[in-house]
C-alpha cells in the first residue's frame, strides 16, 4: 500500500474527524458556474437557481432535452472557477472543488464522453465512477455507494467535493432490483425498501 485516500502512507496518522461527526450547515456561499458569455446554461442557473456550497440540486429533464450538455457545462464551470490546488488555472479562487461524476446505468458512449469532459476540464484531477447499463443491479448500486464513501473521505480531509450523479432514477431502479422485496409496491413499481 503506497497511498491512503491520495496521501502517502507515512503522512497518515489516523487522526481525522468522522463524516458523521461533522456539522451540517445551511449554504451561505454560492458556487459560481458561469464561465464565458457564449455558455448561457450555467449563467441562467446562477441567476435563476443558484447552487451553494453544501446544497443538493436536482436536474429533472425529459429524454433528449440536453441534460448531458447541462451536466458537462456544470462540470466545466466548477473546474474553471474552483480549480483544485494542484491544477493550474488562470482563475485565482479561495476555494477549490474536487469534482466526482457518478454515472449509473449509462451507455458506454456516454461514460466515455463524460470521462473525457472531466479529464479535460479538471486536468485529470476529477474522478469518474461509472457502471454501464448491462451490468448487474448490485454492481450499479455498489458504484454509487463507493463514490459516496470516497467523497466522504475527501470531505473529512477538509476538501470541498461536488458529486454529479446521473441518474438518480437509474440508481433507484438498481436498488429496486438488487434488494429483496418487501411484498409491497409503490406507484411506479418501486418497492419501499429500495428507497431507504
Model-assigned labels for residue ranges:
Residues 7-10, 65, 170:
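Short beta-strands and strand-coil junctions in structured, solvent-facing domains, enriched
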Residues 6, 59, 152:
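Residue-level marker of positions within ordered structural domains that often coincide
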Residues 1-18:
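Interdomain "pre-motor" coupling segment immediately N-terminal to P-loop NTPase/helicase cores
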Residues 4, 104, 168:
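Short loop/turn motifs enriched for small/polar and acidic residues
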Residues 9-14, 31-33, 40, 156:
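Active-site phosphate-binding and catalytic loops of NTP-dependent enzymes
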Residues 111, 118-123, 127-129, 137-196:
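Conserved P-loop NTPase nucleotide-binding/switch module
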Amino acid at each position: 500500500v503506497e497511498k491512503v485516500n491520495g496521501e502517502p502512507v507515512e503522512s497518515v496518522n489516523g487522526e481525522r474527524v468522522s463524516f458523521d461527526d461533522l456539522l451540517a450547515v445551511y449554504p451561505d456561499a454560492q458556487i459560481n458556474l458561469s464561465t464565458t458569455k457564449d455558455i448561457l446554461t450555467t449563467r441562467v442557473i446562477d441567476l435563476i437557481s443558484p447552487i451553494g456550497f453544501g446544497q443538493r440540486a436536482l436536474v429533472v429533464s425529459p429524454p433528449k432535452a440536453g441534460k448531458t450538455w447541462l451536466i458537462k457545462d456544470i462540470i466545466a464551470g466548477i473546474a474553471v472557477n474552483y480549480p483544485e490546488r494542484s491544477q493550474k488555472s488562470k482563475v485565482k479562487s479561495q476555494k477549490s472543488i474536487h469534482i466526482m461524476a457518478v454515472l449509473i446505468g449509462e451507455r458506454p458512449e456516454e461514460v466515455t464522453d463524460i470521462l473525457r469532459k472531466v479529464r479535460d476540464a479538471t486536468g485529470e484531477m476529477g474522478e469518474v465512477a461509472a457502471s454501464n447499463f448491462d451490468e448487474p443491479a448490485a454492481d450499479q448500486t455498489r458504484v454509487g455507494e463507493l463514490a459516496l464513501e470516497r467523497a466522504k473521505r475527501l470531505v473529512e480531509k477538509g476538501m470541498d467535493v461536488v458529486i454529479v450523479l446521473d441518474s438518480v432514477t437509474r440508481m433507484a431502479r438498481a436498488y429496486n432490483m438488487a434488494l429483496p422485496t418487501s411484498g409491497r409496491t409503490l406507484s411506479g413499481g418501486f418497492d419501499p425498501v429500495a428507497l431507504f
